[in-house]
Amino acid sequence: MGPSVAVVGAGPWGTAIACHLAERAHARPSVALIVRTREAADALRRERRNDRYLPGVALPDALAIDDDPARAASAGIVFAATPVKALEDVAAKLARAGVRAPLVWLSKGR
């Protein structure tokens, strides 16, 4: 079974949002953080930290980490926390992966 919430983008904003959602014990959402590369996914799973973008913050055990956009295909909602310039590329990758859930773009700049 896939996540109920997927967050695409493991920069500071995406990591913080994914951690926040995964820590909501009362809601118990299943949250997946989708990253660009297998190497990044492996490192985040192994270290349970994203010190490059969010130093000193542990990733919750409940947070799944994957590099495959198809992991988001079963999500009820997808948050994309990437730069605006990546919007077209990320949306196309998600569509090719079969993602049909509402997509909320969390961009705060270019």
Could you say what each language-model-derived stretch is?
Residues 59, 65-110:
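Rossmann-like NAD(P)(H) cofactor-binding subdomain of soluble oxidoreductases
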Residues 1-54, 64-67:
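NAD(P)+-binding Rossmann beta1-loop-alpha1 motif at the extreme N-terminus of oxidoreductases
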